[in-house]
Amino acid sequence: PGDEEYTHAMLEKFEEEHPDIQIDYTFMPYTDHVEKLKVDLSAGDAADVYGVQTGAMYKEFRDFEEDLTPYLVKEYGDDWASNYNEYAMSLLKGDDGEYYAVPLGLSYAGYVWANMKYFDKYGLELPTNYDELKEVCKTFRDNGEYPLVIGAKDSWINIDTWMNIAADINTEKLYSAIEGETPFTDEDLVQSFQIWQNCFTDGVFQDGALGVGMYTDSTDMYQKEGSVPMILNGSWSLGAYMDSDEQSQEVYNGEGANHKIFLMDWNNDGKIAPVEEA
């Protein structure tokens, strides 16, 4: 979403180098892509090549995925994996030791994006922990502004945010729980769910957040309208600085534009932890 011009450039470059291949493409929000992919795969009508996030979704489609290892060895040699980020490859290695995908990119989730014109207007500093975040959001609300915006209608941003909270509290327990080795009733994980719930009850997230999607309902408010002080999203949103859309250019690069991106200390213990995704 929001990357159409970059995608067009990549497609044009690919077709220039491979004139015998024509690519048919459709742009859609990521959530719609996932739902369509489920239907198309079940019907045997899916694209030959598709992209998904690592983790549960990557494993969910395993019955439809082919081991790419022999193709990669044939094309690039036995040391083909060294061409990719080691951490990204570790996320893609199947339980059988095979690879059913290769990395398209590695980015960080769990960031808070801030439009500093709102902070300057009300004389506020960027919050560094949850207690400060509550106070900042209260000030924004008291002045008729939005607090921290999230498109909680979409499951992926909820998962990204909760994982960031859980990783901030205890990274080892988070990934141990994902592997089924630590129960989700562990006190640190319970605390992460409590903080997540508190974001709604403490007024940190905007009212009605569960009924609003990320792309493009929430992202347009921050990126194109410049009408909200803060939004949760990943590092991939840096592409907005190069977006050719006139509204985005004005918000991000216009006179006086000033945006910050930072990670939150959710449990007030003085440390932060991003969630990584391939």
Label the model's feature ranges.
Residues 1-9, 30:
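Extracytoplasmic "Venus flytrap"
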Residues 197, 221-236, 241:
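Glycine-rich, aromatic-lined ligand/substrate-binding cores of catalytic
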Residues 54-110, 125, 134, 140, ...:
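Hinge/lid segment of periplasmic solute-binding proteins
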Residues 95-104, 110, 134-182, 201, ...:
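Extracytoplasmic/periplasmic solute-binding protein
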Residues 1-2, 21-26, 49, 100, ...:
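Short, well-ordered beta-strand elements
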Residues 139, 179-210, 264:
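Glycine-centered hinge/linker elements that transmit conformational signals in sensory
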Residues 12, 16, 22, 202, ...:
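Extracytoplasmic/periplasmic substrate-recognition and gating elements
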